[in-house]
Amino acid sequence: YFFVNQESFWQNDELSDLENCHISLYRNHFSENEADRYLSNLKKINWKQNEIVVFGTKHLEPRETAWFGDSGVSYKYSGIVHKAKPWFPLLEDIRVRVQVASGAIFNSVLLNRYRDENDGVAWHADDEPELGAFPTIGSVSFGASRKFQLREKSRKGEIFTTFLHHGDLLIMHPPTQQHWLHCVPKSRKKTTERINLTFREIV
């Protein structure tokens, strides 16, 4: 089911009863001033554009990433092993806010920097073994509004769409990752920078 704060989550009003999908969306969870300050500071971290192999061919990921977390935490996705850099106060502040809203504990965060409309992330689920059987994912958006889409794993059926805006918090509760895929598609319209933080617990 969906819980939505302040406005309708999806363009389709009938989605409140989606099976095996539990998503909470808090619009403007971070005030405009807070979101501006966080975005300004997060731009300064050491971003990296990783190289991945798709069907035997090397490609640069269409976004930049950074990985932070507790000591010793590592995470593998798209064939890349990420070793966490230590938390710093600004990230700690955001983590506390997300933990309070979600009721979950997070020991790491993956940051994605979408530089413009040419950056995105393909269909996927955050269901790697390191995340445990029933992960909760806390996703914070700063910067440009971008489309967020969702569809069932079991069939290539209807795609459900919303936009995530500056300061929004989206929480994907279990069992969402087991049954649904999500993506941030590249945009046909010119966009500016967006930074997304996805908090998670590595077990």
Where are these regions (language model features)?
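Non-heme Fe(II) oxygenase metal-center motifs and adjacent flexible, charged/small-residue loops
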Residues: 1-203
